[in-house]
């Protein structure tokens, strides 16, 4: 959000004319702030609460996440469904073509990874301390439901795309419920990007540290234009298509 403000106020580049705003997981809050839904102060406050709530939902070291590379969502869903009596795992992120993240308790993830190995599906444990975006985050959902209800949400100045549904959000009345649901829900990033492309978007601008989302978007559709803004030099190079 800070970089967004710098681009807009100091460099006079009007990113507010973007057709859509979207963010991945925690980044969805930055998208809301950039679209004028939340104030910067409220965004910082609720993210601090969110972080503590999610970390406290599962004892440290008891849960985790596994990234799966080179497989498709249908295959992973099938593996989880076929083994539901042996372990319980959840698709947490549908990031792009060939990149899926699964959450669960450590013991269940180990069993799941054995199945992946048997099918020669590449996977790697992520260095995280909790199983985000699954029903194991229920305690965090309860906390966030109460805290989000206290916030004032303005009507979005731009169309937002929800992590939970992968679809457009047209008014603030839906936003609070979707943000609460986001805690336990799959991040439908691939679906979100495809929606925007199908609505005519041909250029994406990633604002924030790193270029992870840029890479994901390119894997979803190599024909779209993708730019990442991480610092002042990137801002000077930005070229927004009319």
Go through the PLM ranges and name each one.
Residues 1-78, 126, 203-233:
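FabD-like malonyl-/acyl-CoA
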Residues 16, 34-184:
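Alpha/beta catalytic cores of group-transfer enzymes, especially the acyltransferase/condensing modules
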Residues 1-18, 149-242:
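Acyltransferase/transacylase module recognition
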